[in-house]
């Protein structure tokens, strides 16, 4: 969709297997399992950059983490247009969709 921004919240080492073209990457948790506080800043920046009406689509490995975080951003932080890639990257690949190489330039 033109008014959607996709945010891949998987771990960095999972990005090495590829990412969905056009997505932004910001891991939800660090290697120790602690929440990445910069994720909130990234989502706010994307929403402000694109306009508050933008839809933020969270992408995780299997969709579960994305669903939990998407719900938190919608309910606790007041983001109106939040959704999740159902089934995550696993479902994406099951549907024979492509991934592109992750570039470590940001």
Model-predicted segments: where are they?
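Rhodanese-like catalytic fold shared by cysteine-dependent sulfurtransferases
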Residues: 1-4, 12-57, 61-106
């Amino acid at each position: 969709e033109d008014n959607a921004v996709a945010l891949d919240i998987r771990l960095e080492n999972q990005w090495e297997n590829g990412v969905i073209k056009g997505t932004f990457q910001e891991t939800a948790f660090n290697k120790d399992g602690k929440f990445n506080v910069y994720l909130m800043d990234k989502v706010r920046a994307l929403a402000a950059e694109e306009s508050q009406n933008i839809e933020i689509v969270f992408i995780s490995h299997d969709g579960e983490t994305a669903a939990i975080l998407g719900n938190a951003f919608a309910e606790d932080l007041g983001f109106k247009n939040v959704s999740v890639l159902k089934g995550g990257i696993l479902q994406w690949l099951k549907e024979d969709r492509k991934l592109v190489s992750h570039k470590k330039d940001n």
